[in-house]
Amino acid sequence: MNIETIDHIGIRVADLDRAMTFYELFGFKVIHKADNDPVAVVKNDEGVELNLVFNANDDNGGDNILMDIPTKYAGFTHVAFRVNSVLETVNILNANGIAITQGPVKFGREGHVSV
């Protein structure tokens, strides 16, 4: 398995606008935010990318498949690795007793795949 880099880190937030403003203090710029989209993508000049996911409270009703607990709280949800081959990575994980519980699922931009 060849991990090329960390692609991004997902963070659940209770207030998307407040979170975007907070990360702007650290030099992050919003590179993706669509109307009615509960995700904002921010990136700094060094290339660190964060996915800010707004559905950190039960009142919003949003499910996040990337958190395998029933109650959703603000905080870390996932780290995404960029690999040279998703199929090879899945095969290596399976061969080492690591179960893939979902996917691969294509989503988002630039051919992202979730497992």
Question: Predicted segments — roles?
Answer:
Residues M1-D17, F76-V79:
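N-terminal beta-strand motif that seeds the catalytic metal site of vicinal oxygen chelate
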Residues E4, D37, A74, E110-H112:
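Loop/turn position at the start of each blade in beta-propeller repeats
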Residues I11-N51, N55-N57, A95, G111:
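Core segments of cupin and vicinal oxygen chelate
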Residues D15-D17, N84-L87:
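Helix N-cap motif at beta-to-alpha junctions
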Residues F22, L87-I92:
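Short amphipathic alpha-helices within nucleic acid-binding modules
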Residues V41, F81, V90-V115:
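Vicinal oxygen chelate
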Residues F54-D68:
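Short, flexible, mixed-charge acidic loops at enzyme active sites
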Residues L66-T77:
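Helix-adjacent hinge/juxtasegments
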